[in-house]
């Protein structure tokens, strides 16, 4: 059993980024219109810097950063495997490299597959950075995924064969995307739901806002599981999130003699999405757990205002 509390996390003063963080060999960030993302990219000291331009943001060629100074990767399609493979192919050798990833602007499915791919490629550790906004632009009306298809699917390679005789359990991280929440719940209709709410939230009003948005998702909020089985994890702490998932899975396997099909659906902050990825890499893969997400066709380029604070997470992939 892994104790995720031993993983190291610390706040970073955003006016002293270069002083508080070491020099890196490789820095990766997903380009969008957020000043949080652009400020960090400019402030980080790294031998090589890579912009990953997600197709879901639909940037024109004129809007994409110049490739004269830093590497710019423009994947050919939206699949997680294509985006990550094109990124890693451009980066090249990862051995003995000090790697930093700004997870703030990443699409969830790509972030999860990237963490799994780093593990597969022998990377033992990396630093992840997450920047908190002061507030979301439209409060409880903020839209993140602007267009999704009708497809819900597992992350590439992050799935297990289900047993029709076992009980389905869906551990779902609750965020602002009520449409995605509704899609996931409908896809696993009949499963036992285990909602994980982001609390403490990034700010005092965000928990209430996400709860109000989740209420729009339909029948899942009328299910008794919504109240009786809810859990909480801090919105800005991936390791605490991984611990909540780990403890819950162990509890379910103990109660049902391991006869469970377990599905994870990270729909909240990128810090918590990282926590889902860390759990899967260190425990969920061997347990046979599937991570599900609705297919996102377009995503809002900027949903927030201001930079509240930065967090640095030392992610260990070999424990």
Regions found by a protein language model. Give the residues of each.
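Long, low-complexity, Lys/Arg-enriched
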Residues: 1-98, 106-319
